[in-house]
UniProtKB/Swiss-Prot annotation:
GO terms for cellular component: glutamyl-tRNA(Gln) amidotransferase complex. The gene is gatA. It comes from the Bacteria. This is Glutamyl-tRNA(Gln) amidotransferase subunit A. Belongs to the amidase family. GatA subfamily. InterPro entries: Amidase, Amidase_CS, Amidase_dom, AS_sf, GatA. Heterotrimer of A, B and C subunits. It comes from Mycobacteroides abscessus (strain ATCC 19977 / DSM 44196 / CCUG 20993 / CIP 104536 / JCM 13569 / NCTC 13031 / TMC 1543 / L948) (Mycobacterium abscessus).
Length: 492
């Protein structure tokens, strides 16, 4: 069983589809690992053992009958608790949705089920995906398997920790300003933020609608590509869904694994390096750039001057959208309901419920957003931030006229200690410095492990960025780099 949980998803799929092992065996092995380790790591908010084993048996029966539902059929997965699931709770890490079981599946959930992928359970996250450490979860923080006194990143730290702790071979996250890529960097896993609109947001509980994007996470680039292919594609139920062909990311990953990057133009973003970055992170990044050069890539410096303003623009746009989206949690139709004893008006019930149900970071962002959208301040704050967003997108478009992909460190430092930044929101926000420009532009990005920092022995991530609808470039470059880098130590 120990051997099974350490296999990558592609290898597990091959074993299951050939009949050497059953999906039930693989799923049970991962459920056993969750049972024996999650008291330490707290990666899961809900474990759906019975449902996962039933789904695994269905796959085994289909294979016995000569039918394989998909390339990943039978390989179990951990799902971030922000996607609706009709048969298990969806809490978004918040007390206001405690024990809420939605009446429908998100499109991503439905596509996973349709592909025969057993869902092991729902993973921990910062409340409503607001945070960079998973410390904002109403159900307690997730701990990093590399060092249990440190954070696994956020908001999707549960999914990344589950991968690093061998509790799951695959996971799904969401990325609003780096919530897939940043935890991947801190846990030595692979995480991809797809092009905005290429993975359906139907059934994804919204944080910031123009920024949120679901995406795949795994321990290898190929596994991530295989999962990406399952969840991507147009969805008429999502008004922001892009009706364009999805690039063949699996073929790109397989091609990249050959290690040849001749003719690929790589840009190093000048603004995302230097002061404020941990020396060990920069040393790892510089070594990764040298490796890309050795693989045949043409590496040049690229300037994106408006990245300097990305952080303040993001933290005006995001809270503004949060303020609007979270207004729907009014205690009228579902979720927590406080003060409903006949002595309070509907408005009082709403106020009492929101006061008790939302955590401090969510309240902070609602207040900032409400202020930024208020009459007299809209143009000065939200309107100006949207103009900066346009300038950042133009910076990237100009950069891609010169290069095929851009590379940066995925995070300024390695994983920080639990509690270190909780009382300093600005320091926490600055941790997203490298990742959030991509979300403002709607482009795609990947974090792939680039080794361990010489400073503290903790994981470091290389961020690869590409234009909209060029997700295949991420996989080609990421797989080539992964092959050249070689195997890394595991957290456990």
């Amino acid at each position: 069983m120990t051997d099974l949980i350490r296999q990558d998803a592609a290898a597990l799929a091959a074993l299951i589809h050939s009949g050497e092992v059953s999906s039930v065996e693989v799923t049970r092995a991962h459920l056993d690992q969750i049972a024996s380790t999650d008291e330490t790591y707290r990666a899961f908010l809900h474990v759906a053992g019975e449902q996962a084993l039933a789904a695994a048996k269905d796959v085994d029966d289909a294979i016995a009958a000569g039918s394989v539902p998909s390339g990943l059929a039978g390989v179990p997965l951990a799902l971030k608790d922000v996607f609706t699931t009709r048969d298990m709770p969806t809490t978004c890490g918040s007390k206001i949705l405690e024990n809420w079981v939605p009446p429908y599946d998100a499109t991503v959930t439905a596509r996973l089920r349709g592909a025969g992928i057993p869902i092991l359970g729902k993973t921990n996250m910062d409340e409503f995906a607001m945070g960079s450490s998973t410390e904002n979860s109403a159900y307690g923080p997730t701990r990093n398997p590399w060092d249990v006194e440190r954070v696994p990143g956020g908001s999707g730290g549960g999914s990344a920790a589950a991968l690093a702790a061998f509790q799951a071979p695959l996971a799904i996250g969401t990325d609003t300003g780096g919530s897939i890529r940043q935890p991947a960097a801190l846990t030595a896993t692979v995480g991809v933020k797809p092009t905005y609109g290429t993975v359906s947001r139907f059934g994804l509980v919204a944080c910031a609608s123009s920024l949120d994007q679901g995406g795949p996470c795994a321990r290898t680039v190929l596994d991530t590509a295989l999962l990406h292919q399952v969840i991507a594609g147009h969805d008429p139920r999502d008004s922001t869904s892009v009706d364009e062909p999805v690039p063949d990311v699996v073929a790109a990953a397989r091609a990249g694994a050959s290690g040849d990057l001749k003719g690929v133009r790589v840009g190093v973003v000048t603004q995302l390096r230097g002061d404020g970055y941990q020396p060990g992170v920069m040393a790892s990044f510089d070594a990764a750039v040298e490796q890309l050069t050795a693989l045949g890539a043409d590496v040049v410096e690229v300037s994106c001057p408006h990245f300097e303003y990305a952080l303040p623009a993001y933290y005006l746009i995001l809270p503004s959208e949060v303020s609007s989206n979270l207004a729907r949690f009014d205690a009228m139709r579902y979720g927590m309901r406080v003060g409903d004893d006949g002595t309070h008006s509907a408005e009082e019930v709403m106020a009492l419920t929101r006061a008790a149900g939302f955590g401090p970071e969510v309240k902070r962002r609602i207040m900032i957003g409400t202020y930024a959208l208020s009459a007299g301040y809209y143009d000065a704050y939200y309107g100006r931030a949207q103009k900066v967003r346009t300038l950042i997108k133009r910076d990237l478009e100009r950069a891609y006229e010169q290069v095929d992909v851009l590379v940066t460190p995925a995070t300024p430092t390695t994983a920080f200690r639990l509690g270190e930044k909780v009382d300093d929101p600005l320091a926490m926000y600055q941790f997203d410095l490298c990742t959030l420009p991509l979300n403002l532009a709607g482009h795609c990005g990947m974090s792939v492990p680039s080794g361990l920092s010489a400073d503290d022995g903790l994981p470091v991530g290389l961020q690869i960025m590409a234009p909209a609808l060029a997700d295949d470039r991420l996989y080609r470059v990421g797989a080539a780099y992964e092959t050249a880098r070689g195997a890394l130590p595991a957290a456990l």
